[in-house]
Amino acid sequence: LDSTVVHWGGEMGRLPVIQNDTGVANFGRDHNTYGFSMWVAGGGFKAGGTYGETDEFGHRAVKNIVNHFDYHATLLHLFGLLPDKLTYKQNGREQTLLDGQPGKVIPGLLA
């Protein structure tokens, strides 16, 4: 795993409560970008630890708060890629993974 990153997760979690905003039998848990989980191994990530913490409901991060742009910046750093140089076209527009957002490398995740 020295040169391979194994990642399991997504850019957002799910709310820790069941919602029914429509008044019909349409129950579910909406997206939650304020509290989410990732599992990573190898490729320069620190082994055997956790980073961050949510409130007692699992709704919002309360310790070592990061967002998905920070996580993407950290991945790109470990891959040796510059976030503003890695581009792709979408609907005729050059895009970057961070989409102009100020993602920062998360030192606490690095080995």
Model-flagged regions — what are they?
Residues 1-111:
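Ligand-binding pockets and gating/stacking loops
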